[in-house]
């Protein structure tokens, strides 16, 4: 009897692991990129938030706010509403102070973390439309994490061009 109970328990663990697939690593990876984004923003002096590598290229604050807007927009495609205060895409250009940018960044990172952590496997398989194209919710979450990492690389380059070493590299 104990063998049967053990077999049932083990099979449920393996069955659960199979349904998680790639997504079992999402939450730790999201936490990792979130910590790095916040740490890099905090390590960047206020005056460097206006820095841009050239004309017509996003400034440091604009890159962070682009991540914020992207997080909330992509998350809204999966169901949660965008914050009312996130009035327009112009916030990329109007929210430029370090404290404000970090506050918005943290809010957007937490929103993604909470939404993903509460999603059930069926939620991740649900179909949604984004810009007229069919997608699965899990594909949207993949886009969110790829987008955050893409701009993390950009922000690391900005930091290094300004003599700032990312805190995790010191």
Residue ranges and their predicted role:
Residues 10, 43, 66-69, 107, ...:
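Residues within well-ordered alpha-helical secondary structure of globular protein domains
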Residues 15-19:
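Boundary at the C-terminal end of the N-terminal hydrophobic targeting segment
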Residues 93-128, 135-147:
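Acidic/histidine-rich alpha-helical segments that form the ligand environment
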Residues 36-41, 75, 111, 115-116:
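Well-ordered alpha-helical scaffold segments within catalytic/enzyme domains
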Residues 3-14:
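Sec-dependent N-terminal signal peptides
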Residues 27-31, 35-38, 46-90, 129-170:
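Short, contiguous alpha-helical
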């Amino acid at each position: 009897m104990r063998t049967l109970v053990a077999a049932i328990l083990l099979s449920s663990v393996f069955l659960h692991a199979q349904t998680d697939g790639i997504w079992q690593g999402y939450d730790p990876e999201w936490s990792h990129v979130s910590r790095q984004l916040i740490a890099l923003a905090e390590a960047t002096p206020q005056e460097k938030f206006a820095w841009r590598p050239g004309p017509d290229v996003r400034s440091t604050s604009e890159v962070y706010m682009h991540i914020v807007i992207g997080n909330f927009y992509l998350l809204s495609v999966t169901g949660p509403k965008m914050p009312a205060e996130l009035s327009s895409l112009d916030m990329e250009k109007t929210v430029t102070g370090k404290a404000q940018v970090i506050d918005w960044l943290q809010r957007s990172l937490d929103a993604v973390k909470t939404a993903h952590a509460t999603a059930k496997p069926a939620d991740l398989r649900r179909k949604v439309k984004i810009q007229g194209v069919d997608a699965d919710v899990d594909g949207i979450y993949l886009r969110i994490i790829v987008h955050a990492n893409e701009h993390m690389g950009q922000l690391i380059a900005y930091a290094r061009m300004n003599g700032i070493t990312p805190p995790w590299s010191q």
